[in-house]
Amino acid sequence: MSDYKELAWQGLWKNNPGLVQLLGLCPLLAVTATLTNALGLGLATMLVLIGSNILVSLVRDYVPKEIRIPVFVMIIAALVTSVQLFINAYAYGLYLSLGIFLPLIVTNCVIIGRAEAFASRNSVVKSTFDGLMMGLGFTLVLCVLGASREILGQGTLFYGADQLLGEWAKGLTIQIWQVDTTFLLAMLPPGAFIGMGLLIALKNVIDNYIEARQPKVELEAPARVRITKVN
């Protein structure tokens, strides 16, 4: 398997930041009440992750090891501020919905973890691809959790899409079924914990099924050699 296929496999499935590493759980559980919020936060996180990996890879040879973590945090904070200002200017409704969890991307362990573990030790191209795959894997988990909670909670999909994509996106809202009142368990944090647990369990079931279908290689027992003492 090539390096890039391995990076894609690691980010999207085997070492997924949300399902395996369980990083960034605070925003993951807090803002995934709707698919729109989940997609918005996922895209913002992915942009910061790609940008931080690129910049860290560029400066890795010029930053002393003793101060690398503060420098990485400053780079991430600058990128988060830029993304925050962009969303504030062009998607103000989404900016209000995400609230404090948008600037808290700075403290997301996924970003600082990839900067330290990968970007600081690899080329710009590989670091960019790693950031893309890790960010995409995290975004997919956010979207699946957000979509399931929104459907169960209020029977819709892409509700409030205009906050992310503009006025034209109002027509994207899909009414799955009509509900008189929202299913609060799905919309509140307890529902997020239950949904996340089910996603992790589903991934484990799939992994176990794939592993069970793999042909088992039987190791041959080492042959015993009889040593006869000769006088």
Swiss-Prot record:
Per the UniProt record, which EC number(s) apply here? Answer: 7.-.-.-
- The protein depicted here goes by the name Ion-translocating oxidoreductase complex subunit E
The domain of life is Bacteria
Task: Give one GO biological process term.
Answer: electron transport chain
Which HAMAP family is this protein grouped with?
RsxE_RnfE
Question: Subunit arrangement?
Answer: The complex is composed of six subunits: RnfA, RnfB, RnfC, RnfD, RnfE and RnfG.
The species is Shewanella piezotolerans (strain WP3 / JCM 13877)
Query: What cellular component terms from Gene Ontology apply here?
Result: plasma membrane
User: Where mainly found?
Assistant: membrane
The family this protein is said to belong to: Belongs to the NqrDE/RnfAE family.
State the organism's lineage.
Bacteria, Pseudomonadati, Pseudomonadota, Gammaproteobacteria, Alteromonadales
Transmembrane annotation, as ranges: 18-38, 39-59, 69-89, 93-113, 127-147, 182-202
